[in-house]
A protein has these predicted regions:
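Feature primarily recognizes SF3-like P-loop helicase cores of small DNA viruses
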Residues: 3-42, 53-77, 81-168
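Conserved catalytic core of Hanks-type protein kinase domains
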Residues: 48
Length: 168
């Protein structure tokens, strides 16, 4: 919606370096049609979600490094339950979507026409919620903070702002 990228849907990276290069060159990482998540990728996604760096020796040198630092939102798509390790699950919002009934199906061209018609409304609603969450954040209280406490506070502030903005 706000980060157009020629490779907006990517396949599973072969190594962490590929993931971090993608993160350096875009604001949203979208991995499409995954069958499962290998342990090394789960760990790398955790670092990327909360902020981390990747260092590798610079080509044609003995002692120089290239360091890539990034903190990015990530979308994962697959048929099976993808996140199985607790550290990744604690950083995730899991959505299990129903199968689209036959009578509700449409072509991709039709979908995008309908989406473009409401795009300004969607973006406006999202910005209203973010603006409200920024106002609410300092007053948010959670009785028992979970492991990802800052995210929980932000999500709660967004939820409160959404209710106050009457965005559906």
């Amino acid at each position: 919606m706000i980060d157009p990228n020629k490779a907006d849907l990517r396949s599973e990276p072969r190594e962490e370096r590929d993931l971090m290069i993608a993160a350096k060159n875009g604001w949203l990482i979208t991995l499409d049609n995954l069958s499962h998540i290998k342990p090394w990728l789960s760990d790398a996604l955790c670092r990327l979600a909360t902020g981390g760096g990747f260092a590798v020796r610079q080509n044609y040198t003995d002692d120089e490094e290239i360091i890539i630092e990034a903190k990015r939102p990530i979308l994962l798509n697959g048929i099976e339950e993808l996140a199985t390790r607790s550290d990744l699950l604690e950083r995730a919002i899991v959505l299990i979507l129903p199968t689209i009934r036959e009578e509700k199906r449409r072509t991709e061209a039709q979908f995008w026409r309908e989406f473009e018609a409401v795009r300004p409304l969607i973006l406006g609603a999202l910005l209203d919620v973010v603006s409200g969450a920024l106002r609410e954040y300092e007053s948010v209280r959670i009785e028992k903070l979970p492991r990802m406490a800052d995210f929980a506070l932000w999500a709660t502030a967004c939820e409160t702002a959404r209710k106050n903005a009457d965005v559906s």
